[in-house]
Structure formats: C-alpha cells, structure tokens
Amino acid sequence: MEEVEVAEVKNARVSLTGEKTKPMKLAEVTSINVNRTKTEMEEFNRVLGGGVVPGSLVLIGGDPGIGKSTLLLQVSTQLSQVGTVLYVSGEESAQQIKLRAERLGDIDSEFYLYAETNMQSVRAEVERIQPDFLIIDSIQTIMSPEISGVQGSVSQVREVTAELMQLAKTNNIAIFIVGHVTKEGTLAGPRMLEHMVDTVLYFEGERHHTFRILRAVKNRFGSTNEIGIFEMQSGGLVEVLNPSQVFLEERLDGATGSSIVVTMEGTRPILAEVQALVTPTMFGNAKRTTTGLDFNRASLIMAVLEKRAGLLLQNQDAYLKSAGGVKLDEPAIDLAVAVAIASSYKDKPTNPQECFVGELGLTGEIRRVNRIEQRINEAAKLGFTKIYVPKNSLTGITLPKEIQVIGVTTIQEVLKKVFA
C-alpha cells in the first residue's frame, strides 16, 4: 500500500467573507443601515435603488460601442470625489482612458488607472490601494492563472466573478464589472453569472439614436425594471430628466396612425408615441413589421380588431413602431397600439391631447392595469386633457381635476368615442 499526498485545493472558499461561519437565528442577526453613495447622475442613482451600496457587485451589460465604458468612466470621475476609485481595464491602455476621461470631466487625485488582465495582480493592487470603488472593464478580459482555460471562457469568467464577489464582501468595496453581450442580446459567458452578482444592469439604445436606456433587470438593493435615460453627446452622457417630453416633442398634430400611451418603467411613468401605418397589400400575404414593439402582441391586437371591431385587416400591410427608439413591452400598451392601427386604417387622426392605457383581451374587453393613478397624474402633469383607461381600474383612486378620465370596457366602445 502506497501513501499519496493530496494537494490542497487552492480555490476552495470558506464563505463570501472568507471566514468560517455557523448557523444563526434570524432574530440574532445584527441589522445594519446601508449608507449609499450618490453620484451626480440622478438617473444612475435611481436605477441602483438610491445610490451605490458598499460591498455590492454590479454587472453592466450592453452591445459593443453602446457606451458602457463611457458611463462607468463618467461615474468613476464622480465617485473619485468622495472616495478612492481603481479602474482596471483589460481592453484599453491607461493613455487611451486618460484621453476619454479628460473629455468627460474633472479628474480627481483619488482616481487610479490600472491596465491589467491578471486577477492575481488586480487583487494585489486592491490590497495595496484599498479603494472604495473598483471597476473591471471587462470581465471577459480578466483571467486567473490558477484556472485552466483562456480569457473569456466559462470557467475563467465564473471563477473570476466569484473571486470579485468575495473581494467585495471581504473589503466592503463596491465593484462594477462590464460584461459583453451576445448577438441575441444576452450576457456572454455562463448564465450563472447573473445569479452570482447583486445587480444586473443592461445599457440599451439604437445605434441611430442618441438616447440610451440603463435598465435594472435584477437588484438586491432596489426595485427591478427601473430605468434611467441618457443622451449621448460630445461631452459624454447627459441625463434626460423629462423623457416623456423628449419622446413626444416631434409628434405631428393631425397625423393619422399615432397615439400616446402612458407606460411604466419600473416605478416611473413615461409617455411615449405609438405609430402605425396600414396600407393595402400589393402581393400575396399581408406583411407585418414591428420596431420597438413585440411582434406577437401586435399580431394578436390586429386579430382582435378584425374579429371584434370589424376592421378588415387581412389584406392590409401593417408597420408598427414606438417613436424615439424606446422599447414598449408591457400589456398596458395594447389599447394605444389598437387605436393607432384603427387611426391609420380609418385615415382619421386622434386628438393630440388624448392618451390611452389598457390591456386588450381576446374578446375585445379592456382589462385593468397596475399603477393607474401614477399614469393618470403623469398625463395630467404633461398637459393632456383626456385619458382612456380600463373602467375596472378606477375603483378607490383619487382623480386629478386637470384631466378628464374616461373608463372604458371594450375596444368597440373606445373606437366609437375616439373616432365619432
């Protein structure tokens, strides 16, 4: 019999904090008040739930060139005024980052740049500098020499993220990591990456529009589906504090195929324009195209309009879009989409001072939606004089005097009142 010495496993972790723990009663756990660090960008603070939480691990994903590095560089310059920032880049040199940082704003003395891809070296510098905030750009470029596999591989991304999580919890450092996305729009790397971090943010936008949307899809320290809206300018990202006004400012009065919806993004009401163009089909089957709207939802709405409202759409091409590049995907947009389609089909414009909220059922009924009071108040604040909402949603709410609220039950009733 031969005795064999077993090598110690280097990657074994005791806990998130690196210390041995034992089970505790929930009542015995000490509560703490988390002091969030606010940036100068209120839109960014809102998406995070009120500011940056110490010891949190935040993942930001988005298409290449959409502005992820610009956003984090801008946030870093602001955070360096209240704490020490270490910006680790595996994609650009320190000189390249300096050029961009000078364009974005003042650079504080507590802003450290580090062009490195070795996780051991990054950990060593974190222990030496002891920053309050750490930015990793990007997670796919950082590798640990203790793990087999090339940069960006599943094993490397998983282990480096786990090490960063332990680093954040042990040293109470807020860490932001940039993640690439695939052509399908999901984060590249293992799916468990999103489960490991505290917060997942997506930075979205159309290449041909200057507006960018920062969306929270997971947040352990705040509500999900919150959004922040920015505009990309020569000096960096600028907050859009009144997005409804921006999305509606180019709307033409008297144009057919247009309607306004009050949609909710997280806890925030936003008014957006839905446009429809319905034209006779020239060849074979009717064509359906959507931009910023769900294709299946649009097809369902057109089927309901044909069956319940008597619109002959089977031989009509339909082109639908949300103006301004914003994506609308909640059920409450159904009524506005239906009205826009009917407006184009009938070639009759809607009243520019009217807006619409409601989910459309297959039998033609208008179903209740959430946060109806917030939606009505937002429409009134922006000067709209009339809003169509589900009648069942009006129970127990206080209606503002500045706007006429019309409760409706069916799509036939809505079209009769709008196009009378």
Curated annotation (Swiss-Prot):
Residues 317-420 are annotated as: Lon-protease-like. A motif (RadA KNRFG motif) lies at residues 218-222. The keyword Membrane does not apply. InterPro entries: AAA+_ATPase, DNA_repair_RadA, P-loop_NTPase, RecA_ATP-bd, Ribosomal_Su5_D2-typ_SF, Ribsml_uS5_D2-typ_fold_subgr. Disruption phenotype: Natural transformation efficiency with chromosomal DNA decreases to 10%; uptake of replicating plasmid DNA is unaffected. Increased sensitivity to methyl methanesulfonate but not UV light. Its EC number is 3.6.4.-. One of its GO terms (biological process) is recombinational repair. Belongs to the RecA family. RadA subfamily. NCBIfam families: sms. The middle region has homology to RecA with ATPase motifs including the RadA KNRFG motif, while the C-terminus is homologous to Lon protease. Unlike most bacteria many S.pneumoniae do not have the N-terminal putative zinc-finger. This is DNA repair protein RadA. It comes from Streptococcus pneumoniae (strain ATCC BAA-255 / R6). The lineage of its organism: Bacteria, Bacillati, Bacillota, Bacilli, Lactobacillales. The gene is radA.
